[in-house]
Amino acid sequence: MRMKKCPNCKNYTLNTICQCGEKTITVKPPRYSPTDKYGKYRRMLKKSIKQ
């Protein structure tokens, strides 16, 4: 079983059909990269949330 997301209502589910009746799509995590382009911004956001 894989987690799926409804493109219509943006809900996550394990079913192939969402409660709204739309067919769900498989959610894929972002590809790993040693040179993370957005790591700087993610760390800045994390710091601002902690403060």
Swiss-Prot record:
One of its GO terms (molecular function) is snoRNA binding. Keywords: Ribonucleoprotein, Ribosome biogenesis, rRNA processing. GO terms for cellular component: ribonucleoprotein complex. It comes from the Archaea. The keyword rRNA processing applies. One of its GO terms (biological process) is pseudouridine synthesis. HAMAP family: Nop10. Belongs to the NOP10 family. Involved in ribosome biogenesis; more specifically in 18S rRNA pseudouridylation and in cleavage of pre-rRNA. This is Ribosome biogenesis protein Nop10. It comes from Methanococcus aeolicus (strain ATCC BAA-1280 / DSM 17508 / OCM 812 / Nankai-3). The gene is nop10.
